[in-house]
C-alpha cells in the first residue's frame, strides 16, 4: 500500500483587473514569456510543450507541460514536469489556475500540487518563485489594454 503524501504551493492574489486581461496573461505565449518563462504554450487541452530559461545548478532550465483543463476566464491546468535526463524520477506536478470575479477585480489562485518528500528543494523554490511570479503577472496585466 502506498501511503506517500504530497504537498502543494498555493498563492492567491486579488488583482484590480478584468477576468479577460488576467486570462490573456496566463494563456497567451508572448504574455507568459513577459512574466514567467519563454514557452510554446497553447491553451488547448492535450497540447504539450516546454517552458524554458537558462539552466542553473541542479536544473537544466526546461519544464515539460501538457494542458489538462481549459475553462475560459475561469480555470486552466497543466502538468509541470522535469525534462530530459532529469525526467526519470524527477519533478511531476500540476499547476492549476482559478480565476474568480470579485468586487473590483479578480481573485487569482495558483496551486502547484504533487510535491513529494524528495522534492523539498523544488517545493521551496516554487514557494518563492510563484510569489514573485504573481507579482510579475500583475505587472504585465496592468499594461494590457
Predicted features by range, described:
Residues 13, 63-69, 93-100:
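Hydrophobic/aromatic beta-strand elements that line small-molecule binding cavities or substrate pockets
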Residues 83-131:
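Beta-strand/loop substructures that line and gate deep hydrophobic ligand-binding cavities in soluble
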Residues 19, 68-75, 98-107, 142:
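A short, structured loop/turn motif at beta-sheet edges
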Residues 41-82:
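Glycine-rich portal/gate segments that line the openings of hydrophobic small-molecule binding cavities
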Residues 139-145:
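Short, highly charged C-terminal tails/helix-capping segments
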Residues 6-12, 48, 62, 75, ...:
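Intrinsic-disorder/low-complexity, polar/charged segments enriched in Ser/Thr/Lys/Arg/Asp/Glu/Gln
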Residues 1-40:
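Hydrophobic ligand-binding cavity/cleft-lining segments
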Residues 22, 32, 49, 67, ...:
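Hydrophobic pocket/interface hotspot
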Amino acid at each position: 500500500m502506498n501511503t506517500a503524501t504530497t504537498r502543494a504551493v498555493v498563492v492567491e492574489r486579488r488583482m484590480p483587473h478584468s477576468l479577460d486581461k488576467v486570462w490573456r496573461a496566463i494563456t497567451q505565449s508572448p504574455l507568459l514569456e513577459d512574466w514567467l518563462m519563454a514557452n510554446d504554450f497553447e491553451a488547448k487541452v492535450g497540447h504539450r510543450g516546454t517552458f524554458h530559461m537558462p539552466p542553473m545548478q541542479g536544473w537544466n532550465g526546461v519544464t515539460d507541460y501538457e494542458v489538462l483543463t481549459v475553462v475560459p476566464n475561469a480555470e486552466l491546468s497543466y502538468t509541470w514536469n522535469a525534462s530530459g535526463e532529469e525526467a526519470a524520477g524527477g519533478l511531476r506536478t500540476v499547476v492549476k489556475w482559478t480565476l474568480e470575479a470579485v468586487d473590483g477585480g479578480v481573485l487569482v489562485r495558483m496551486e502547484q500540487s504533487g510535491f513529494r518528500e524528495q522534492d523539498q528543494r523544488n517545493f521551496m523554490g516554487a514557494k518563492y518563485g510563484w510569489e514573485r511570479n504573481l507579482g510579475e503577472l500583475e505587472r504585465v496585466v496592468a499594461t494590457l489594454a
